[in-house]
């Protein structure tokens, strides 16, 4: 039986990447060492690190005036690092809240300043994104923060917001899933465990002119400039996670880049949403059509009892990790870059059969 893992994260990795890592596990390129054993300052790992950054820059066409940082601490650490580094003498910043992770981000940021909510989708139950014409930004804000894709609610921005201040985006769950104009952002960050690689690595892309103005008392490890000046080698980096991310970047390049993966993601999500919408109400997706996520697809059935049966039977059929987040319930299929089209086809076939038996 073929197994398909629909986990929201840590998520599945491309099979080609796993096989390559398996081949090189005990002997990387004839070095006699596993990447896990290498000195992070040795020439072998330095070449791995350099290629990973070069490939990422090529994939996203990152301008030269942006630094790429390979950090630790997960996206949670960025909820503090962003205000510590980007308030830059100001006392306030704006946050757009479209779900759980936006709420967590502003709660943490309020430890460091007067953070305002410029817009929120809470009134609609976080099932959509308020039109930007209704936002109330502060022109004196240090930055504007938003989450491009909310994994729990399945709400994804179909546009890059206009902003007169540095734009900060948490792209943890849709990084590299579609082309993005990096030059429109002051800072992008992403935890690795959804579209980049295994857990333990956090990527930051930051414009150089925003560096070097941290809040007084900022810990050294939370200073972007310290890491930028040391080329992400201020302390021992998560070497194996960087190596794995590099393999994922190579896999993306070999499979049409971000434009190619965007087309496949649209095809996968389109099939799944069509199945939901054409089920005569047996399955329901609560998210507004125009901002439905192509990464995380939440849906409900008529009763919680039926939802539990769906998840249990899917698990027995090799369709794993479909239970919705504990805060909202229901069912959620996470179909990140590495999910093959065959996995979504298997899921929709199961959905059709389940609806036939229980409809």
Swiss-Prot record:
Any GO CC annotation of this UniProt entry: cytoplasm
Domain of life: Bacteria
Stored Gene3D superfamilies: Aspartate Aminotransferase, domain 1, Type I PLP-dependent aspartate aminotransferase-like (Major domain)
Record PTM N6-(pyridoxal phosphate)lysine, positions in chain: 194
Pathway assigned to this chain's UniProt record: Amino-acid biosynthesis; L-serine biosynthesis; L-serine from 3-phospho-D-glycerate: step 2/3; Cofactor biosynthesis; pyridoxine 5'-phosphate biosynthesis; pyridoxine 5'-phosphate from D-erythrose 4-phosphate: step 3/5
The reaction(s) this protein catalyses: O-phospho-L-serine + 2-oxoglutarate = 3-phosphooxypyruvate + L-glutamate; 4-(phosphooxy)-L-threonine + 2-oxoglutarate = (R)-3-hydroxy-2-oxo-4-phosphooxybutanoate + L-glutamate
Keywords: Amino-acid biosynthesis, Aminotransferase, Cytoplasm, Pyridoxal phosphate, Pyridoxine biosynthesis, Serine biosynthesis, Transferase
Biological process (GO), any one: L-serine biosynthetic process
GO molecular function: O-phospho-L-serine:2-oxoglutarate aminotransferase activity; pyridoxal phosphate binding
Chief location category: cytoplasm
UniProt keyword Cytoplasm present: yes
A UniProt-annotated Pfam family: Aminotran_5
EC number in record: 2.6.1.52
Residue sites binding pyridoxal 5'-phosphate per the record: 101, 151, 170, 193, 235-236
Compartment list: Cytoplasm
Needed co-factor(s): pyridoxal 5'-phosphate
Cofactor note: Binds 1 pyridoxal phosphate per subunit.
Residues bound to L-glutamate: 41
Function: Catalyzes the reversible conversion of 3-phosphohydroxypyruvate to phosphoserine and of 3-hydroxy-2-oxo-4-phosphonooxybutanoate to phosphohydroxythreonine.
Family annotation (PANTHER family): PHOSPHOSERINE AMINOTRANSFERASE
Family the entry assigns: Belongs to the class-V pyridoxal-phosphate-dependent aminotransferase family. SerC subfamily.
Subunit structure comment from the entry: Homodimer.
Annotated protein name in UniProt: Phosphoserine aminotransferase
């Amino acid at each position: 039986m073929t197994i398909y893992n629909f986990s929201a994260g840590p998520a599945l990795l491309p099979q080609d990447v796993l096989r390559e890592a398996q081949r090189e596990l005990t002997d990387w390129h004839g070095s006699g060492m596993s990447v896990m054993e290498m000195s992070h300052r040795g020439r072998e790992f330095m070449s791995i690190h350099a290629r990973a950054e070069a490939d990422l820059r090529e994939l996203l066409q990152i301008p030269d005036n942006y630094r790429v940082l390979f950090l630790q601490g997960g996206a949670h650490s960025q909820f503090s690092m962003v205000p510590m580094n980007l308030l830059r003498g100001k006392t306030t910043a704006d946050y757009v809240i479209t779900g759980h992770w936006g709420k967590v981000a502003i709660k943490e940021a309020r430890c460091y300043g007067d953070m305002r909510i410029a817009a929120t989708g809470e009134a609609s139950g976080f099932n959509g994104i308020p039109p930007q014409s209704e936002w109330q930004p502060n022109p004196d804000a240090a930055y504007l923060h938003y989450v491009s894709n909310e994994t729990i609610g399945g709400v994804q921005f179909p546009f890059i917001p206009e902003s007169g201040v540095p734009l900060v985006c948490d792209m943890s769950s849709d990084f590299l899933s579609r082309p993005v104009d990096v030059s429109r952002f002051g800072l992008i960050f992403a935890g690795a465990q959804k579209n980049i690689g295994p857990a333990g690595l956090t990527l930051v892309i930051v414009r150089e002119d925003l560096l070097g103005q941290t809040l007084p008392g900022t810990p050294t490890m939370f200073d972007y400039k310290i890491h930028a000046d040391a080329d992400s080698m201020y302390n021992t980096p998560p070497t194996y996670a960087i190596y794995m991310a590099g393999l994922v970047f190579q896999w993306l390049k070999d499979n049409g880049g971000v434009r190619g993966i965007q087309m496949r993601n649209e095809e996968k999500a389109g099939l799944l949403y069509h199945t939901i919408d054409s089920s005569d109400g047996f399955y329901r997706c609560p998210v507004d059509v125009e901002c439905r996520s192509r990464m995380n697809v939440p849906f409900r059935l008529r009763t919680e009892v039926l939802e539990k049966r769906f998840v249990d039977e899917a698990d027995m059929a090799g369709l794993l990790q479909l239970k919705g987040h504990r805060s909202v319930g229901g069912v959620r299929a996470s179909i990140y870059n590495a999910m093959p089209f065959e996995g979504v086809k298997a899921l929709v076939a199961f959905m059709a059969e389940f609806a036939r038996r229980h409809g």
